[in-house]
UniProtKB/Swiss-Prot annotation:
InterPro entries: KH_dom, KH_dom_type_1, KH_dom_type_1_sf, Nucleotide-bd_a/b_plait_sf, RBD_domain_sf, RRM_dom. This is Insulin-like growth factor 2 mRNA-binding protein 3. The gene is IGF2BP3. GO terms for molecular function: mRNA 3'-UTR binding; N6-methyladenosine-containing RNA reader activity. One of its GO terms (biological process) is nervous system development. The lineage of its organism: Eukaryota, Metazoa, Chordata, Craniata, Vertebrata. SMART domains: KH, RRM. Belongs to the RRM IMP/VICKZ family.
Length: 584
């Protein structure tokens, strides 16, 4: 995305005029300006400079009396589902942006772009071309908190590789049918082993030159020796004391590269008489940190004891919407820090793979579920590859309502700390309203059972995808607002009601089904004994666990109930069509 389109040019604008403009603005360019009547094209050295040119010039600079427009140059065949939205208010809440984007269709992905400007920039992928076109028509120039949004297409490489579909197929949110083409980005992503989670490090800025080496010789040697791809993000956070490094390789390759980098920094510190301790700093997405720490900090303590290191983790308060990573600081010798890195990353990779498995299973249980748009999983900008979520299998689709029918609504009672009610509701009820719109669910908070009640019940009503979105955001909000400590994982209790005649099927013979359910989902599932069915002949099933565990358990129980309903329907059909002989 380093090729630029320059529009709204006067008839007399020459390549020299544009060269002077770019030089005056200190924006480098490569090659010649290709000038046409009213517009021109030029290449920047990289995507970062292209973004700076857009921010500095578009709608801000006049040439021969006309205000010029600068955008990414996008071939017509690649103007499909991907948009870039600029000039977003810097303190805008994520839920507000979410709900605004969702008005025009299914948002498959939304990632922030690093820029030097005060305002935010995001790249958005919509579910289809029409949704993106509608969004660009409605949002370009849209006033949001006194900021005028700027929206333009960015290249959609997938659109260029796929032939146009003659007939629309499937429901909104479904991807292409059949496997992706060989060589396509999605094919590559699907084949990528899930263990290939990159290692993200923070290194002092003064050592970056030594790590790169003269004309890049040192970094090339490391990549060759470890069979890895190493990105040093020098341009991020200009003037910062530390720079992130992303290492893509096998777990062994990442660890070897990490150790070599630590050795280079130590040697450079000795040569420059730098006396301060240089700890190993690892960046990890907040989603994984709770499991790394473990219950009461046991996992972290064990790593410290086994590796003879001191490990600290940055506080939750340091997190922002666009920076969901925590800094894990490891102090010790190079050898002990290297051992600690292996153990820390092993735990993070396990958590990542478990979440991938849970999310993929969710996609099979809820066909068309758009996981990337939920904001519940690390974006690729954090250095962790996004999960490859395929469309549902035929077997899963068979249990889903036929096209044209709405999925059945469910009611879940989720119990949250009583002190968290204000955060969930928000000022004048704004947060709960935004959450309800975003998820497409009815969300109500039941009155407290008493003045000293420690828990409050949130009643969520909506189809499976709405449940997933609403509950996921509630879990996230509780963690974000520090209602659970930095060493705690958010675990909540959810209640769902099932017909009393189906409770036995949930439990299974000798408790077999409920035990299998707990093993599969890692959630605690309890069907209290001796329950008196309510006026609708229903009993409560209690589910306790972290978000993915709780969701999987809910889906599996709903699957059991759907199976029971189908069997009942079949029996009714048989009885009405072919009367069964009575037993004597």
């Amino acid at each position: 995305m380093n090729k630029l389109y320059i529009g709204n040019l006067g008839e007399n604008v020459s390549p020299l005029d544009l060269e002077s403009l770019f030089k005056d603005s200190k924006i480098p360019f490569s090659g010649q300006f290709l000038v046409k009547t009213g517009y021109a094209f030029v290449d920047c050295p990289d995507e970062s400079w292209a973004m700076k040119a857009i921010e500095a010039l578009s709608g801000k600079v006049e040439l021969h009396g006309k205000l010029i427009e600068v955008e990414h140059s996008v071939p017509k065949r690649q103007r499909s589902r991907k948009l870039q939205i600029r000039n977003i208010p810097p303190h805008l809440q994520w839920e507000v942006l979410d709900s605004l984007l969702a008005q025009y269709g299914t948002v498959e992905n939304c990632e922030q772009v690093n820029t030097d400007t005060e305002t935010a920039v995001v790249n958005v992928t919509y579910g289809n071309k029409d949704q993106a076109r509608q969004a660009i028509e409605k949002l370009n120039g849209f006033q949001l908190e006194n900021y005028s949004l700027k929206v333009a297409y960015i290249p959609d490489e997938m659109a260029a590789q796929q032939p146009p579909q003659q007939h629309p197929q499937g429901r909104r949110g479904f991807g292409q049918r059949g496997p992706p083409r060989q060589g396509s980005p999605s094919a590559t992503t699907r084949q990528k082993p899930q263990s290939d989670v990159p290692l993200r490090m923070l290194v002092p800025t003064q050592f970056v030159g030594a790590i790169i080496g003269k004309e890049g010789a040192t970094i090339r040697n490391i990549t060759k020796q470890t069979q890895s791809k190493i990105d040093i993000h020098r341009k991020e956070n200009a003037g910062a004391a530390e720079k992130p490094i992303t290492i893509h390789s096998t777990p062994e390759g990442c660890s070897t590269a990490c150790k070599i980098i630590m050795e280079i920094m130590q040697k450079e510190a000795q040569d420059t008489k730098f006396t301060e301790e240089i700890p190993l700093k690892i960046l990890a997405h907040n989603n994984f940190v709770g499991r790394l720490i473990g219950k009461e900090g046991r996992n972290l303590k064990k790593i410290e004891q086994d590796t003879d290191t001191k490990i600290t983790i940055s506080p939750l308060q340091d997190l922002t919407l666009y920076n969901p990573e925590r800094t894990i600081t490891v102090k010790g010798s190079i050898e002990t820090c290297a051992k600690a890195e292996e153990e820390i990353m092993k735990k993070i990779r396990e958590s990542y793979e478990n979440d991938i498995a849970a999310m993929n299973l969710q996609a099979h249980l809820i066909p068309g579920l758009n996981l990337n748009a939920l904001g519940l999983f690390p974006p690729s900008s954090s250095g962790i590859p996004p999960p490859a979520v395929s469309v549902a299998s035929a077997a899963a689709a068979a249990s889903y309502p036929p096209f044209g029918q709405q999925p059945e609504s469910e009611t879940v009672h989720l119990f949250i700390p009583a002190l968290a009610v204000g955060a969930i509701i928000g000022k004048q009820g704004q947060h709960i309203k935004q959450l309800s719109r975003f998820a497409g669910a009815s969300i109500k908070i039941a009155p407290a059972e008493g003045p000293d009640a420690k828990l409050r019940m949130v009643i969520i009503t909506g189809p499976p995808e709405a449940q997933f979105k609403a509950q996921g955001r509630i879990y996230g909000k509780l963690k974000e607002e520090n209602f659970f400590g930095p060493k705690e994982e958010v675990k909540l209790e959810a209640h769902i009601k099932v017909p009393s005649y189906a409770a036995g099927r949930v439990i299974g013979k000798g408790g077999k089904t409920v035990n299998e359910l707990q093993n599969l989902t890692s959630a605690e599932v309890v069907v209290p004994r001796d329950q008196t069915p309510d006026e609708n002949d229903q009993v409560v099933v209690k589910i306790t666990g972290h978000f993915y565990a709780c969701q999987l358990a809910q889906r599996k129980i709903q699957e059991i109930l759907a199976q029971v309903r189908r069997q009942q329907q079949q029996q009714k059909t048989l009885q009405s069509g072919q009367p069964q002989p009575r037993r004597k």
